[in-house]
Amino acid sequence: MAETSVFSIMMLTVMTAVGRGATDRPGRVSRCGERPSANASVTYNLLSRIVGGTSAVKGESPWMVSLKRDGKHFCGGTIISDKHVLTAAHCVLDKNIEYHVRVSIGDHDFTVYERSEQIFAIKAVFKHPNFNPIRPFNYDLAIVELGESIAFDKDIQPACLPSPDDVFPTGTLCIALGWGRLQENGRLPSSLQQVVLPLIEYRKCLSIMETVDRRLAFETVVCAGFPEGGKDACQGDSGGPFLCQRSQGRWVLVGVTSWGLGCARKWVDNILDPPERRGSPGVFTDIQRLLNWLSANLNQDKPDFPTYEVQCSTNDGIEKGTAGEILLPTDYRKYYSNNEKCIWTIIVPKGKHILLTFNSFNVEWDYSCDLDYLVIYSALGRLIGKFCGDVRPRPLLIADASVTLKFISDFQEYKTGFSLFYQAVEPNTYPDSDCGSVAVIFEEGEIQTMNHPHVYSSHANCQWVVHSPANHIIKITFLVFEVEPSEGCIFDRLVVYHDLQGTMVAGIFCGFSLPDPVLSVSNVMQITFTSDYSVNYLGFQAVISFVLPSSPVKSETQWKGNNQPRKNQDAMQHYEEGCGVSPLPPRFIHHNIIKAEEAMPNSWPWHVSINFGNKHLCNGAILSKTFVVTSANCVADREEFPSVGLIVAGLHDLESSTDAQKRTVEYVIVHPDYNRLSKDYDVALIHVQMPFQYNSHVQPICLPDGHSKLEPSKLCVVSGWDLNVELSTKLQQLEVPVLMDDVCKKYYDGITDRMFCAGVIAEEDNVSCLAQSGAPLVCQSDPGTYVIFGIVSWGVGCNEPPKAGVYSSVPLFIPWIMETILSVAGIANTDTEPHHPLIPPDKLSQEKALLPDSPPSNDSSSSQDIYVTCKDVMSLQSPGEIKLVASAQDGPEGGRCQLIFQAPEDHFILLHFKQLSHEHYSLIIYEGASSNKTFKAQLTEEKIPTIMKSVGPVITIEASSTAQDSALHLWLSYSFHNQN
């Protein structure tokens, strides 16, 4: 009877959790794929552009290796264990390589000594036996065994090898590293370089390579790169790592740099170019395809290591019946093999459910279970649990008649494995949930979302019921918490109840802030987790503990909670003071340039929906409290009936606009040169009747200066509700590379100087459907700050083979945009009528009150227009216009002067720059004056803002030169405005 009681409790004690040991042991001295010395806020810049390479940040690549011959770098490599480095086979063809080559790790800049740098001798080299140096296109991989072991620390760590079931989809942005040449036949850099490249579909790569040489056959390669070139690995990068990031953050060695035709050459339309000018994507040796060879050679020095010729050391496959046992390995005295991949599918009679009970469990531990692990999938392929460590997982009740188990082991560290018993049970024996299992917990331990530490599943509906011993209450303490944020937690949520009926709510949680511990009011607690159909994060991990009611409790508020999204307070102290900064920073899970993903709610706070007839028509971006920019083709036919238009800001879900700001359109201003047929000058401004109220969901986007130009392959972001062919009700985001003009013109007729293309030319989803018109394309300027560079104009239809999107180039329209807004506000020409007859004259006074977002008018009736030379200090206390000139004639050592603009105490200053040209002059702008001034900006001819706003009432422009051939011409207007 006692035995039956114990088994009954075991059946009820069901939870989906990562098994772990009783102590928080590291499992290994190192943690592969992590960067301990890198700043937590710093990551590989996936929105950077590199031609041949740009300097990596020291500490970001602790697995990087330099192979040096006679002290000079010639190839790269990657640390994968304390004694092994991976490189390309073609890098280690020297017969006496052990004598001539040394391995340098912890090095970043070759020109300086770094404390982290260590030099190792080579003990042995193992080239893949199928590598052919005459045709070095396949199996280009070698293991370098070091003479001594590496001592891992914060500066030196191994990269992760891929597991057999790692999948990185086409378009995923990955990183290549090396000290290779910055351009074809160019110079070698002194510091480590990095380049961001998207993965190319395998068959697409093969078709490209046929244009290079039809005789080439590729079996073990992975390709990456941009069709228009501009980014690539280059000479000297050979053997270096090509890494992709798992969803939970670890970096995986997907490839080893092998070869490419030229460096960063374009390969789009290769067949049209002469052979000597053709290019190719970057070609990397595919590590995943060579895992078996790696495992066999990395474990040669382990005498007790079991070797198997088959992929799985036991009999896997289909298990049918009402009960049975699965063992790995089959002999309890042995270990499981490294590099194993075993798959079992359990099928019980139709109408039954499956109970899994673990008898033993000992699998290499890792906090994210990425090394060795057992995963369990439902019949529909939904992940139920992922397990590692030496603690037996609790019994799992699978709400189906079929379940799949997969065991994966990596190339090092092996344990005694596991054994489990499966049994068919009646469906109604225990309550099920859509998680595929139910958790009824009687013991202290951990719970977590399915698939943690990977993203949780869509449509989850999970439930845990916790019972504590008599005279105890339950405490849940959160270790990890990342759940899709939303106001009121309406999308994904974790709810804690004080009762089994679900009537006493202890707390509702979502977002990224770690909730406070939650205490029950009795010895029962119910926890539910639900998710909608999209936007999945890492979920939560929490500790369940039992405490006495007399234990100290902060207050009753500790029992309740509502975990709302974090604000980006550091980036934006006040909503009114900035542009292009999201209080809820954007976040990408997949970093894919082909398939869009749902944006984190309100992370693009300038994006608006333009509605006509109560339906979403197209997109736009907020420029000020009263102006929105969009495409002319969106609104050109609606100029005469603007009042039927509605601008919806702060919107994430088109079907749920409860918290959004809705503004009626006052008038529409289409660029006067807009051509309906050619879509040239495809830009328009929309003025709303009532100003937007800036908050965490509604913010303006920054405008670029008129001289800005995007370089090819620059990665930017386009947002919209329709990026993946079908119209999505929730806002999506997609990273897109900017294409070269000639590539764009090859695919589209009618590309003008006011257009550019961005996106991927591939047989995937089109990014420029009709309903996406007007959507903003934004690029990072400073970290966390975005600038609008493009407005979606047109593209091919959604049902055709896609091409890149065509965008109106915003920098070229800056003069028109600013002139229009200024004329409405009455600044640019206060004594003249507005430039656009659609703007009623009686609206000008209303506009003046809306600054600084719409550039304001002067508060003072007096003004001064001054023409001065650069000498001494000049104080300007009335608004007006000034032209500052200087030349070598001003003095034998050039000129030096200060312009101090002094507004009333409660005002700010608006500078409107009209012209700047200088030779050997330094122009610096400061907030404040004299000893109280602080640096604000440095002006150059290439980087001059159209308008600059001060924070306080005083701003200083300092011009200086010591050169005899110096010259300066600065022309600007300035105005003072009330802070209120």
Curated annotation (Swiss-Prot):
It holds the Pfam family Trypsin. The keyword Ribonucleoprotein does not apply. It catalyses: Preferential cleavage at 371-Gly-Ser-Arg-|-Trp-374 of glycoprotein gp43 in Xenopus laevis coelemic egg envelope to yield gp41. GO terms for cellular component: extracellular region. Disulfide bonds join C75-C91, C174-C244, C205-C223, C234-C263, C312-C342, C369-C388, C435-C462, C489-C510, C618-C634, C716-C779, C744-C757, C769-C798. Ca(2+) binds at V112, E117. GO terms for biological process: proteolysis. It is an enzyme of class 3 (hydrolase). Residues 312-425, 435-547 form the CUB domain. The keyword Plastid does not apply. Its EC number is 3.4.21.120. Glycans are attached at N39, N766, N858, N932. It is found in: Secreted. Residues 835-863 are annotated as: Disordered. The catalytically inactive 108 kDa form is processed both N- and C-terminally to give rise to catalytically active and inactive forms. Differentially expressed in the oviductal pars recta (PR) region. Residues 22-49, 593-980 form a propeptide. GO terms for molecular function: metal ion binding; serine-type endopeptidase activity. InterPro entries: CUB_dom (IPR000859), Peptidase_S1_PA (IPR009003), Peptidase_S1_PA_chymotrypsin (IPR043504), Peptidase_S1A (IPR001314), Sperma_CUB_dom_sf (IPR035914), Trypsin_dom (IPR001254), TRYPSIN_HIS (IPR018114), TRYPSIN_SER (IPR033116). Keywords: Calcium, Disulfide bond, Glycoprotein, Hydrolase, Metal-binding, Protease, Repeat, Secreted, Serine protease, Signal, Zymogen. Residues 50-299, 593-822 form the Peptidase S1 domain. Belongs to the peptidase S1 family. Mediates gamete interaction by affecting the vitelline coat. This is Ovochymase-2. The gene is OVCH2.
